[in-house]
A protein has these predicted regions:
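Hydrophobic and amphipathic membrane-targeting/association helices
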Residues: 1-268
Length: 268
């Protein structure tokens, strides 16, 4: 029996080599995912949050009923509307990549050419828009545009520009191409720009987002998100916290103004 296996040793060696080669190719092509974490003190009136101490007297009189608790605030933090605002603010509905061999590299914050396409126009897209940009050191670019990608209404057209900035107008709106001052063009190259509906992008970010309280006795919540680009994940969480706090302060000011008007009316 041993002899039968020995005479077939080349097959075993070949199998091991093939498996190792497949594993190496997979590791080279796969994109690592980063887990980004942060903590936030969220608004919670029941635990002495932004409004609890200021309006507790009115609450006792039944004039103010702050029903929001930490669970409500977590729902606000991971709401599609707030996440979509973050997507629009950071322009995350526009994605930049480049292909080298079999691998696609993410160019978030590192694209030599930036595309501006308004969120309002992006919200009218029924399917992703794909732009393939061939650029030269001289500043010349050739843009191939595919609209309605993957749908029955898929259309393709191209246009060349001799310099940047350049404006491309079409039935799907206007796209402005700008040079990235932080990433100068030093050689000819090619990149792909994908523009999607902001709500579709917001849904994917919401799916990758996890928010929860650190304990039952605290108003501190942890926020974590998995993203293939560490800087993009950090920017997303920072902007999410910033916009949540901004909205919370606006709510606080509105309640304070309405309460002041009510007190003035009662006094009068």
């Amino acid at each position: 029996i041993l002899f039968k296996y020995i005479i077939r040793w080349p097959w075993f060696v070949a199998s091991v080599i093939i498996c190792m080669a497949c594993a190496w190719i997979y590791l080279k092509q796969s994109t690592p995912a980063y887990n980004i974490n942060a903590s936030i003190l969220i608004k919670d009136e029941k635990k002495g949050g932004m409004l609890g101490s200021e309006f507790s007297g009115l609450e006792d009189l039944g004039l103010l009923n702050p029903s929001k608790n930490i669970d409500n605030e977590i729902e606000i933090l991971q709401s599609k509307s707030l996440i979509k605002d973050v997507i629009n603010e950071l322009g995350l509905y526009i994605d930049y990549t480049t292909s080298t061999g079999f691998k696609t590299r993410d160019l978030y914050g590192a694209s030599p050419i930036l595309a501006h396409y308004s969120p309002k126009d992006a919200e009218l897209l029924d399917a992703p828009m794909l732009l393939t940009v061939d650029y030269q050191k001289s500043g010349q670019i050739e843009v191939n545009v595919t609209t309605g990608k993957g749908s029955d209404e898929e259309k393709t057209f191209s246009k060349s520009f001799t310099e940047l900035p350049a404006v491309l107008s079409g039935e799907k709106g206007t796209i402005t191409f700008m040079p990235n001052s932080q990433v100068p063009i030093t050689e000819d190259g090619k990149l792909e720009i994908t523009i999607q509906h902001p709500l579709a992008v917001a849904k994917s970010y919401r799916k990758a987002l996890a928010i929860g309280p650190t304990s039952k006795t605290t108003s501190v919540a942890t926020i974590s998100i998995s993203n293939t680009n560490k800087k993009r994940g950090e920017d997303f969480i920072n902007k999410l916290v910033e916009m949540y706090n901004r909205d919370a302060n606006d709510d606080k000011n509105e309640v304070a103004q309405n309460t002041a008007r009510f007190i003035d009316a009662v006094s009068y």
